[in-house]
């Protein structure tokens, strides 16, 4: 995991190593051809071309990660950075500042996806993109998503320091609202970029748990938009030729095995369900156990049944929230609900 600078260095270097050798496999000649096609100059061993002396600024990268973590609505070491809040706006400003320092062309779309572009020698070609997100669920860690954004920017810095000259333009993207924390919609920015019309329509009426609409929340963060603006986020075909994301593992397997890098071949896709239970409410001291129909216990039994199933099947399930309308120790529950998320690669 990239909590240590040397691991972060290897992962940052890997991100662009994969880009420039995407078609190479173990074929050195193919690697050279790929480098030439991507960079726009012949690959040689005579010392000409870009420097092969790549040194990642691990200390600088770690410092940026720590600075970004300070924009949080929860105390360190946790991070809470929810879409369109003041801390989210501060984090966006910080990322754009680094992009500007690197000499990238910076732009934002209508919902706040941020793009830092390093123009290639042939800008008409589809760009190579990399990046991730910086919003954070309540009380999370400081690496999720952030490593993919700051790591990509350090990779750009590294390539610039080494006199690399890209043929295809390179773009670092900071996606808006990867997390579903505020409006219950995950990957909001990237799904709009993918042209999901149903999502664009739904954003006209969606509200958060404080009854603040998406459009009002966006305006509070400086993004005044309407439905037509949402359509402007949709990407044109062939905008990008490739995309790669650097990400922390978020699990214990690689760390436990002492493996510094893993390449994803499949990812568990989520499916979320909300289940409502309705029982018979009553006084906790007066309704005898045989006469009870407790919604909370029914919810607990379902959660345990799902756990048993996924343990046997190899899938994953998480009970995210449990709500009790009574919320009192002197009443047995008449109405309750649970939110579950299941994940699998099948």
Regions found by a protein language model. Name each.
Residues 20-77:
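N-terminal hydrophobic or amphipathic helices/low-complexity stretches enriched
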Residues 70-119:
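A non-catalytic alpha/beta surface segment that caps or lines the substrate-entry region
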Residues 132-210:
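A generic, well-ordered mixed alpha/beta core segment in the N-terminal half of proteins
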Residues 102, 114-147, 152, 274, ...:
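Catalytic-core environment of secreted peptidases
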